[in-house]
Amino acid sequence: MTDKEGQEVKDAPSIEQYTALKDQLTQQILKKQELDSKLSKLEDSIYEKENEYFNESVYGNIVKGFQNFTKTNTGGLNKRRITYTDDDHIFSLSSVNYIKTIMKRQGVNSNGGRNEDLDDYEDSIDPNNGNAGGNTPNTTGTNNQSASQANSNSNQSTPGRKRKIRTIDD
């Protein structure tokens, strides 16, 4: 397209560019959800391994020390179990996400007094058809849509943010 002076003018963003960007966003959201799921499973695995370590180390461990190691036990009657709290899980507590999860499970507000936590929102997409939040506008060219109609349709197909339903397992 050229203007009055014969210089080339760049086209305004087209439906094809919008669709390509929307598809790219959808793929990135799916990838983020997959990585979040893997991270959550890994953090749970680390927590379980810490519990196993605490339970199998009768004579002490690196966190609480080895005081029981040097003491001689009389027939195992004085074997004292060391009690562990969430504060002893030093590897789990090194993860910011895991700390937020624990705080949410305990009902503690972790967002500095704000009413809403932005982590409670998630990007919504339909992974079955790759559609981000709704129907895509008709791009076949057979319908003659005005710009305002295309804009109203594009608002529906933009990925939305919805509040997550929190459960104990989250």
UniProtKB/Swiss-Prot annotation:
<dbReference type="GO" id="GO:0005634">
    <property type="term" value="C:nucleus"/>
</dbReference>
<comment type="similarity">
    <text>Belongs to the EAF6 family.</text>
</comment>
<keyword id="KW-0805">Transcription regulation</keyword>
<keyword id="KW-0234">DNA repair</keyword>
<dbReference type="GO" id="GO:0006325">
    <property type="term" value="P:chromatin organization"/>
</dbReference>
<keyword id="KW-0539">Nucleus</keyword>
<comment type="function">
    <text>Component of the NuA4 histone acetyltransferase complex which is involved in transcriptional activation of selected genes principally by acetylation of nucleosomal histone H4 and H2A. The NuA4 complex is also involved in DNA repair.</text>
</comment>
<keyword id="KW-0227">DNA damage</keyword>
<keyword id="KW-0804">Transcription</keyword>
<keyword id="KW-0156">Chromatin regulator</keyword>
<dbReference type="Pfam" id="PF09340">
    <property type="entry name" value="NuA4"/>
</dbReference>
<dbReference type="GO" id="GO:0000123">
    <property type="term" value="C:histone acetyltransferase complex"/>
</dbReference>
<dbReference type="GO" id="GO:0006281">
    <property type="term" value="P:DNA repair"/>
</dbReference>
<comment type="subunit">
    <text>Component of the NuA4 histone acetyltransferase complex.</text>
</comment>
<dbReference type="InterPro" id="IPR015418">
    <property type="entry name" value="Eaf6"/>
</dbReference>
<keyword id="KW-0175">Coiled coil</keyword>
<feature type="region of interest" description="Disordered">
    <location>
        <begin position="107"/>
        <end position="170"/>
    </location>
</feature>
<feature type="compositionally biased region" description="Low complexity">
    <location>
        <begin position="127"/>
        <end position="157"/>
    </location>
</feature>
<feature type="coiled-coil region">
    <location>
        <begin position="14"/>
        <end position="53"/>
    </location>
</feature>
<protein>
    <recommendedName>
        <fullName>Chromatin modification-related protein EAF6</fullName>
    </recommendedName>
</protein>
<feature type="compositionally biased region" description="Basic residues">
    <location>
        <begin position="160"/>
        <end position="170"/>
    </location>
</feature>
